[in-house]
Amino acid sequence: MFTATANECDKPVVLSVDNILNAVMAINSRVECTSDDIVLAQISLHNEFGFIYSLIWPLYNGAMVCIGRGLRHVDADTYYYNPTILIGTPSMIDYQRAISGFNKELNTIIIGGASCPFRLFENLCDSDLKVYNIYGMTETSGCVGVNELYDGSYTLFDNNAVSIADDGEIIVSGPCVMKGYYNDVESTENVLKDGVYHTGDYGRINNAGRLVLLQRNPDIILLPTGEKISRVRTNEQITAINGVAEGFIIFYNIRLTAVI
């Protein structure tokens, strides 16, 4: 599995079978999937969210998995396979909503790869769909918490695995944490200390014991497509262009924008 870190855009992450099975058990504790379900896999399976949530998890529960052909055919694939559970990123699910791309058999939507905007979450819930937004990253097998409430807070899959550091950083331990970055001890030791993963995200635990995200890792740009971009590395590449004195990337009107 690959992810982006503060200094690299394509960083290989080592996940074990135990990591993946722990994620499956965590999902099963909050979301129902049975042998009667049909799951449409429309996210690339080299992506941790797509691999675990749209392939391994449903297969473990005996559900039928249908492999989609990508975003270009997502509406046709949805009506062809008639899934009961749909897995997607915020941008993918929002696109399907906009084109009325949900089949009548659909009852559950799982959104991951990025935080689900409140507008989209509210709209889906108003359609009598069960909606779950997953919080996690590749380094934690994609299973830290799940949101199914309008307030945007996350129920933790394991209350003992998540804590808040003195500076507000969210840190994660336990069986969901990766083994490390592939063949890179130094990068691993920078974020994984005594088995505790430092996410770079910031948050708090509310009175109900739910996780509230306050800020995502400022060194990484997380797109609604679920893609991650190293802010530092991308800024360096822009500045290295001949004739560019200074450049950086920002979000402007919910769009990724380069300022040069």
Where are these regions (language model features)?
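Phosphate-coordination loops involved in phosphoryl transfer and adenosine-cofactor binding
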Residues: 35-36, 105-106, 194
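Conserved ATP/PPi-binding loop(s) of AMP-dependent carboxylate-activating enzymes
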Residues: 130, 149, 155-156, 165-191, ...
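AMP-binding/adenylate-forming catalytic core of the ANL superfamily
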Residues: 174, 179-180, 202-260
